[in-house]
Amino acid sequence: MPPTESTAHLRTIVVPTDGSHASLQAVALACDIARKNKGQVYVLHVIEVKRTLPLDAQLEMEEAVGDEILARAEEVARRQGFQVETEILHAREAAPAIVDEAVAREADLIVLGMGYQRALGEHQLGRVVPYALENAPCEVWVCRHPAEE
């Protein structure tokens, strides 16, 4: 299927993942768009490093978890016949790291997957979504997973 006019310019796509079902669905969506547009998908996992540690601290357990998460994202892409590039980032906060990576890669789109989150009766966006919507120079799509019954 050829790209539509509204998505044909979306060739470089960044997708952060925490391994959640919603973020893996975002990977699948990004792969679908990039395949149609002959583009590339960069899947990121951000390890938030405490301020008491240096950014390059050896966080073996977090790295192992990140590797597993990125392997699942690669499997999602593989099932769609697509290959993604993956990277683990170390940062103090995930949101600025994601936007900075999108800028560095000259991304056309950031796809954010988020689960259905409610706290105190209100829907919560977390920290990444508002930051990306406010600061990313490219398009940002937020794909919210439906509430579980």
Range-by-range predicted roles:
Residues 44, 87-89, 143:
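Structural motif
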Residues 57-65, 124:
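Alpha-helix N-cap and loop-to-helix initiation/capping positions
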Residues 26, 53-56, 96-99, 122-123:
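Short, well-ordered secondary-structure micro-motifs
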Residues 2-60, 76-78, 82-85, 135:
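Small/aliphatic-rich secondary-structure junction motif
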Residues 112-134, 148-149:
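Glycine-rich, Arg-bearing micro-motifs that act as flexible, cationic patches
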Residues 29, 62-73, 97:
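Short, solvent-exposed amphipathic alpha-helices that sit
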Residues 1-8, 78-110, 130, 147-149:
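Structural beta-alpha unit
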Residues 138-149:
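Short, flexible loop segments at boundaries between secondary-structure elements
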